[in-house]
Amino acid sequence: PFEKQPFEDFESLVHTNYLGYVRLIRLVINDMIKNKSGAIINMVSGSTLCDPVPRSFIVYSSLKVGLKAFCKGLFWEMRDHGIKVTSILPGVTDTDLTGKLKEVTADTSRLMTTEAIENALKFALTVPANVCPLEIAVINQQTPWTAPVIPFKQEHPGK
């Protein structure tokens, strides 16, 4: 629960799930502007589509909603420079991270494969030059996030 998580965990989430993206984009954006081309594709999160936000994902989902808004704003700033900005919103996908989602991993047949996300990425990169898919939501037909609560045990290094 939010009230029991150490503040340091929130800071870590901010650096990983928001500021890391912004810093990386800042490293490349001026060269893209100079070249008048490029594509910025951010893996945001399908959790931005959840209402209500699943328990234990409040801070994470809030940061991802912020990242999605940042990407939309960046699209409007960069489109006249020939730079595309796309947010991919993947649902629960079979990765090492999903091993920490207790309820979700009980039935792995409900999880998407990384191939589905790869296909979304390919789509974003192969649309015509005058088209930019602003957001691509890739959600499993029976995604576990339709459930209102997903128990999540976050591992803390050194604890």
Residue ranges and their predicted role:
Residues 25, 61-63:
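Active-site helix of classical SDR
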Residues 1-2, 6-11:
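Substrate-binding pocket helix/loop in short-chain dehydrogenase/reductase
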Residues 45:
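Residue(s) in the substrate-gating loop at a strand-loop-helix junction
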Residues 24-28, 70-71:
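Hydrophobic positions on the long internal alpha-helix
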Residues 50, 73-83:
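Active-site-adjacent segment of SDR/Rossmann-fold oxidoreductases
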Residues 87, 103-147, 151-152:
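C-terminal helical subdomain
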Residues 1, 27-36, 50:
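A short helix-coil junction within the Rossmann-fold of NAD(P)-dependent oxidoreductases
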